């Protein structure tokens, strides 16, 4: 993907610059980040979602906080800007989970590992991994609210307790602007 684009772009005159949408994975080493930067990558966007080890495990993110931080270090050392998507309001998220996630995010900003971030509210959808896992008996604490059979093309599914996290929306986004 990005590596092939960067290599191909190196042959262009003039080279294009581009922004990539990625997953923070351990494959993003300093050498790869340097190559991507030389090949025109100026910034990346990626979802951290929950900046805690237990949170990443719960949502089956497929990566660990250590890999996310290592990838961010590699990108920043290569001069690449980083934007992260954060998510709050998971069905099983406690206020302490949210505080821990915000603290990790604060530390990442303090260390210069992130340039920007935005908090999004979790939305359960019919085709999401979480919903499919719930159908298989996983996530017994998730309680989807049955939809009306007449709802056409409605992908979002409400769940019990989702409104309890709404009170965090404004404070989380305000904290990013400090």
Stretches found by the model and what they are:
Residues 31-34, 91-108:
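Catalytic cores of alpha/beta
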Residues 12, 39, 70-82, 108-114, ...:
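A structural motif corresponding to the C-terminal end of an alpha-helix
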Residues 46, 84, 105, 117:
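Conserved, mostly hydrophobic/aromatic
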Residues 62-69, 95-102, 170:
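Non-membrane alpha-helical structural segments and their capping/turn regions in soluble enzymes
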Residues 17-20, 83, 112-119:
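Acidic/polar loop patches that form or flank catalytic/metal-binding clefts of enzymes
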Residues 71, 75-76, 82-87, 96-104:
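C-terminal structural cap/anchor segments
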Residues 1-81:
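Conserved SAM/AdoMet-binding glycine-rich loop
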